[in-house]
């Protein structure tokens, strides 16, 4: 089974044993190699892209997905329907025809392998400008944001990232200090429950308040609450975050600091998410906060200076969710139109692998 960070693209360099790009583990990263300023992006001229050439060979539905402009777009794409090609051509169309800067694009995939493939495809269409885009996993994108915003939550920018093994080892120490028998109270089970809570954006204080009395929680739940609080405290003492913290903490910052949310909404005017059916609740909220609009941090439609919502394009297939064990819920794809009432849906139905 692959990890969220497996097979990093060439520019990411080596990965740790846990599969995290080594640049994500330290303060220095690809930002040093790929400066994201507008001046730098404009200097990277790239090659001219003919819109008709980009659209050539696409069927009607694929063309519509590539040139869509305006409100949110859900692309429902079955296996072999050419969704990767559509995403790559859409990004190239944004860069070559609509005048979008590479740094204004955030494309989220579920593996670094997919991110590398996407970047290579776009580079093949528009040239080296593709290097300035953010094409990466949810976790990698959050690492880059958190390196910049760490002080907002009392962290140093060189915070460590605990992988699953590190997290379980810390949980074992926490349970030992609570005098709990590891044979009866399995550290892995506790870690899994904490992960589930974070995927639902339930922090340690919220959970403790929820189960803090005999009327509202069981003895087991109160033990979990104590373990969760102690675990988080020890993470912070070590200037560290675990995998699930990367997303939850980024969401917390975006929601608590409207100026930070506005900064990234102004930056990322085009957000594309692949395999949307595999997103969990925390990832869904992260996308919503980055896009902006009603119900998000700092948004007020009657404020003249408010940043309008970015263009959101998500691709998914409700029949293919493979990350349920990580808290993914196909509710996010099934209720997309409810969450975004002005959304358009395009079906990619032709299977090119079987023709």
Please give the residue ranges for each predicted region.
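Acidic, low-complexity intrinsically disordered tails
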Residues: 1-52, 297-305
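Basic/charged alpha-beta structural segments of nucleotide/phosphate-handling enzymes
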Residues: 3-6, 13-14, 18, 23-24, ...
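Conserved helicase NTPase motor core
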Residues: 51-67, 71-76, 85-87, 99, ...
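ATP-binding Walker
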Residues: 81-82
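A conserved segment at the C-terminal end of the G1
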Residues: 88-92
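Phosphodiester-processing cores and adjacent nucleic acid-binding clamps
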Residues: 93, 102, 341
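Conserved P-loop NTPase-based nucleic-acid remodeling module centered on helicase motor cores
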Residues: 102-193, 198, 202-208, 215, ...
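Interdomain hinge/linker at the junction between the two RecA-like core domains of SF2 helicases
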Residues: 340, 345-346
């Amino acid at each position: 089974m692959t990890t969220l960070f497996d097979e990093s693209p060439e520019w990411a360099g080596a990965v740790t044993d846990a599969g995290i790009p080594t640049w994500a583990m330290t303060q220095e990263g690809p930002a040093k190699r790929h400066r994201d300023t507008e001046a730098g992006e404009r200097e990277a001229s790239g090659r001219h892209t003919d819109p008709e050439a980009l659209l050539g060979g696409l069927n009607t539905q694929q063309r519509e997905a590539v040139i869509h402009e305006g409100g949110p777009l859900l692309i429902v794409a079955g296996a072999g329907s050419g969704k990767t090609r559509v995403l790559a051509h859409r990004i190239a169309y944004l860069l070559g025809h609509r005048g979008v800067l590479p740094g204004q694009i955030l494309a989220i995939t579920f593996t670094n392998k997919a991110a590398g493939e996407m970047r290579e495809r776009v580079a093949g269409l528009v040239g080296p400008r593709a290097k300035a885009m953010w094409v990466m996993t949810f976790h990698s994108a959050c690492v880059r944001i958190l390196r910049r915003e760490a002080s907002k939550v009392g962290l140093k920018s060189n915070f460590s990232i605990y992988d699953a093994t590190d997290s379980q080892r810390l949980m074992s120490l926490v349970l030992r200090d609570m005098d709990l028998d590891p044979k009866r109270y399995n550290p892995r089970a506790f870690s899994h429950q904490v992960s589930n809570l974070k995927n639902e954006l339930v922090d340690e204080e919220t959970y403790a308040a929820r189960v803090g009395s005999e009327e509202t929680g069981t003895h087991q739940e109160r033990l979990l609450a104590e373990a969760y609080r102690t675990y988080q405290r020890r993470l912070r003492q070590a200037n560290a975050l675990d995998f699930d913290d990367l997303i939850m903490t980024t969401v917390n910052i975006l929601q608590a600091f409207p100026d930070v949310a506005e900064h990234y909404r102004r930056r990322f005017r085009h957000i594309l998410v692949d395999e949307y059916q595999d997103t969990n609740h925390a990832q869904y909220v992260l996308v919503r906060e980055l896009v902006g609009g009603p119900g998000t941090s700092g948004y007020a439609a009657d404020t003249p200076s408010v940043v309008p919502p970015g263009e959101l394009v998500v691709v998914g297939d409700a029949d293919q969710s493979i990350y349920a064990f990580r808290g993914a819920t196909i509710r996010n794809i099934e209720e997309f139109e409810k969450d975004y009432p002005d959304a358009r849906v395009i079906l990619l139905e032709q299977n090119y692998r079987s023709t």
